[in-house]
């Protein structure tokens, strides 16, 4: 083929992924082995959020539905970004041509046509939504662009059923170049070199993490912590004793990469309490035998008022231990039960564990909460504690948090400003 086209992108400022602060810039490289009549070279910046909902157990308008007849696939496609730029011929030449579509004869050689795009502040498809269309962004006052999701995962390449259903949603951002040749009815798009024409890239709207952090810093310090109680209470045969676990935290609404999960400074899982209807004798031997912390991912796809959810569990920590609970430090609460602080940070290596330190990618996706028009990705934490009492009774507690905003970016906030050091002014003689 006599014509080749490549799209070359300038790298993102952080070297990993593009953000709202980046300008998507680069050039279209056109290689000609002989002269070609070219009418126009067009470049597009496109962001698409696509979801497919397969027949089966599903929700309609977020309510469970029973299927009486087989259903076909529902497909939903939203163009969250669509920007175009004509890079050839130059604008002054176009203006002089006054609407003429006459092509230009371009001689053999290599040509570079620069371009740049700025991301819009919100999904562009929202203004085109019909009034009755239900989306996950409906009613939002300040909707955000969603991050890339599953753009490297294809349903043709998956090896199991769970991964297949997971692959039925995708958010893809790409730059595409098209070379129009000849007259008005002719166009050229060399499919043999299609990957060079379409350049997919990873996008994360990182300013969202900063906004959540600023909201947290503005929060009233007297706001009570969230309390997450274990799903089931523990009872013992022949006894009126009843036990449960509570996780109390102000900082589980948003979790950032490299946050300490168990240290007191992290304020995530440092306030874990074993609560008892009746106090145990101080001589009792109560121990934590194992600690497990998981991240539960819930990804929901929406199409045609039907939705399917995909659940995954990611292990964050799993530690065997022989931690003895100090029952002498138990306290009576105003509600009448007894509580004992279980200091998980005293268990090695829990005190060293930071959230997503390895920058893990699940099915090729960074750990990041988001809502798009038709894809919702949420996360919860799940804490399992395995207990022994007097070496005889063995039981387990499970605490599940509310949905948490997860970010793949790390943030650092000083707990207090550094001490002010007064410097002596120099003396001049």
Swiss-Prot record:
This protein's source sits in the domain of life called Eukaryota
Q: Give an example GO biological process.
A: ubiquitin-dependent endocytosis
- For whether the record's keyword set contains Cytoplasm, the answer is yes
* One Pfam family cited in the UniProt record for this chain: Arrestin_N
* InterPro entries cross-referenced by the UniProt entry: Arrestin-like_C, Arrestin-like_N, Arrestin_domain-protein, Ig_E-set
CDD domains recorded: ART10-like
Localization in the cell? Cytoplasm
Which is one GO molecular function term here? protein-macromolecule adaptor activity
Q: What is its main location?
A: cytoplasm
Gene Ontology CC: cytosol
Quote the function comment for this protein: May regulate endocytosis by recruiting RSP5 ubiquitin ligase activity to specific plasma membrane proteins in response to extracellular stimuli.
Family stated for the protein in its record = Belongs to the ART10 family.
Against PANTHER family, the record matches this protein to: ARRESTIN DOMAIN CONTAINING PROTEIN, ARRESTIN-RELATED TRAFFICKING ADAPTER 10-RELATED
User: Under which name does UniProt file this protein?
Assistant: Arrestin-related trafficking adapter 10
Which species expresses this protein natively?
A: Lachancea thermotolerans (strain ATCC 56472 / CBS 6340 / NRRL Y-8284) (Yeast)
């Amino acid at each position: 083929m006599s014509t080749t086209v490549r799209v070359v992108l300038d790298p993102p400022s952080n070297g990993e992924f593009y953000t709202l602060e980046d300008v998507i810039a680069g050039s279209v490289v056109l290689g000609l082995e002989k002269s070609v009549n070219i009418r126009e070279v067009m470049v597009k910046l496109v962001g698409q959020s696509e979801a497919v909902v397969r027949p089966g157990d599903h929700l309609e308008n977020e309510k469970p539905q029973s299927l009486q007849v087989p259903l076909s696939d529902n497909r939903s496609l939203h163009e969250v970004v669509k920007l175009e730029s004509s890079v050839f011929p130059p604008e002054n030449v176009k203006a002089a041509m006054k609407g003429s579509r006459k092509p230009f004869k371009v001689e053999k050689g290599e040509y570079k046509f620069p371009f740049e795009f700025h991301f819009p502040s919100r999904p562009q498809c929202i203004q085109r939504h019909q009034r009755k269309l239900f989306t996950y962004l409906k009613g939002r006052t300040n909707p955000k662009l969603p991050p890339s999701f599953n753009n490297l995962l294809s349903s043709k390449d998956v090896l199991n059923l769970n991964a297949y259903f997971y692959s039925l949603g995708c958010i893809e951002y790409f730059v595409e170049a098209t070379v129009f040749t000849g007259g008005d009815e002719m166009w050229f798009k060399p499919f043999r070199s299609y990957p060079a024409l379409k350049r997919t890239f990873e996008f994360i709207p990182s300013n969202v993490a900063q906004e959540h952090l600023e909201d947290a810093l503005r929060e009233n310090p007297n706001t009570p912590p969230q309390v997450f109680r274990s799903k089931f209470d523990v009872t013992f045969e022949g006894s009126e004793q009843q036990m449960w676990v509570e996780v109390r935290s102000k900082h589980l609404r948003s979790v950032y990469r490299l946050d300490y999960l168990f240290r007191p400074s992290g304020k995530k899982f440092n306030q874990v309490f074993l609560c008892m209807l009746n106090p145990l004798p101080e001589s009792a031997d109560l121990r934590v035998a194992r600690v497990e912390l998981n991240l539960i991912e819930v990804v929901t796809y929406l199409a045609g008022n039907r939705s399917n959810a995909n659940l995954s569990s990611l292990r964050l920590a799993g530690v065997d231990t022989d931690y003895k609970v100090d029952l002498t430090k138990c306290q009576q609460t105003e509600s009448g039960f007894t509580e004992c602080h279980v200091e998980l940070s005293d268990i090695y290596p829990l005190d060293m564990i930071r959230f997503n330190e390895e920058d893990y990618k699940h099915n090729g996706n960074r750990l990041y909460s988001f809502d798009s028009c038709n894809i919702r990705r949420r996360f919860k934490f799940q804490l399992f504690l395995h207990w022994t009492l007097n070496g005889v009774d063995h039981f387990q507690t499970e605490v599940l948090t509310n949905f948490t905003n997860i970010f793949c970016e790390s943030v650092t906030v000083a707990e207090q400003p550094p001490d002010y050091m007064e410097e002596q002014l120099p003396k001049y003689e």
